[in-house]
Amino acid sequence: MGEEHRGKEIAHWADSLYLGSNVRVHPLHTEERDGHTVLTVAVDGDYAALGVTEPFQLDWHIDLAGDRIARLRMVEEKLDLPAPVLGFVQAMNMYDLDSMVSRFAPDAIANDQMRHYAGREAIRAWLAKEIAGDRVTMFVTEILRHPGGVAVLAKVTGDYDKTGLSDPLELRFYFTLAGDAIAQLVVIPAKSH
C-alpha cells in the first residue's frame, strides 16, 4: 500500500503479492461510495510476505472506465474492537475454526438466537457446523461499547439456507469479555423479519 503501479507493472505486482505470497482474499461486502465501488475484503495468508501478524481487512476503492478498472486504491480497514473480538471477527471471515474457538474462555457460553452452548467444546461444535461449515462471513457496520464488552452490528452472509431471511442478514453480536477472552456471546437478529 502507498505504491502506484501502471500498465504491465500491475500484473507483476499482483502476481508477486497475491500469487507469490500465498495470499487468500475473501470478499465481505460491496457498496457504492462517493462515486466509486468499494469492495471490502478479508486478507489472510503468508504473514511474513505481507509484513503483518494476523488477518486484516482492506477496502478496495474501484473506479471503472466502461468495463475496465481505471483505478484501484486499497485502504486498510481498521476495526476498533477489543483484541479477542477482533480476533474472532477475523477468524470467522477466514473460516478458521481453531482461531475462533481460541478466543473463548474455557467456561464461555454462547447463545445463537435462543440456542444455548456451554463450554468450548459445545461452542466448537456450533461454530464448526454453522459458521465455518456454512462459510459465514461478517461485515461489521456498527460497534457499541458496553460495560464488560462490545456489541457489534454486522451484515452476515454465507452458504446457509437463506429461506425467509434477508441477504445479507443483519445480526447483533453481544460480546462479554473476561480478561483477554470472550466469556459470553449472544447473537440475535438486528430486527424481526
Each model region followed by its residue ranges:
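Short, well-ordered alpha-helical segments enriched in acidic and aromatic residues
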Residues: M1, K8, M94-D107, N111
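Surface-exposed, charged secondary-structure patches
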Residues: I10-V52, Q57, H61, A125-L165
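Hydrophobic/anchoring residues in structured secondary elements
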Residues: T30-E32, M74, A110, I143-R145, ...
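Short beta-strand edge/turn micro-motifs at domain boundaries
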Residues: Q57-L79, E170-H193
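Short beta-strand segments enriched in hydrophobic/aromatic residues
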Residues: V43-G45, E76, F104, V156-G158, ...
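An amphipathic alpha-helix signature
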Residues: A11, L97-V101, R120, R124
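Short, aromatic-enriched amphipathic alpha-helices that serve as compact interaction elements
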Residues: K78-Y95, R103
